[in-house]
Amino acid sequence: GVFKVTMNESLAVALLTNLLKNAFVHNIDGGHIRITITKNGITFRNSGVEHPLDKEHIFERFYQGSKKEGSTGLGLAIADSICRLQHLNIKYYFEQNEHCFEISQS
């Protein structure tokens, strides 16, 4: 199988931009960002604070795991809303000191 999503271009741009911006804003100096696309989905991974964030609240509007300049607490809520609208799953997990956001088919 192939990970294939058909959606409005503006929604696709908003989804990917919000996840990428989140990875940049909440990274550490000298950190890294990895984007992986597989047949099962797309994953954004980044270095950052060295502990997991609050999975229960991370996709809520105005939630901020860390106070960073340039962050409104809306990006992940928007990404979550777009995923739900498009019948996609988005989940957060912390693995090998990386913050991971994975989008997959429902």
Spans of model-derived segments:
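Short beta-strand/loop element within the Bergerat-fold HATPase_c
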Residues: 30-41
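Conserved glycine-rich
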Residues: 88-92
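Short alpha-helical Gxxx[C/S/T] motif in the catalytic ATP-binding
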Residues: 75, 79
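Short helix-loop "hinge" at the ATP-lid/N-box region of the Bergerat-fold HATPase_c
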Residues: 22-24
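Short conserved segment of the HATPase_c
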Residues: 50-62
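Conserved micro-motifs of the catalytic ATP-binding
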Residues: 4-7
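A residue-level detector for a conserved hydrophobic packing site
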Residues: 12-16
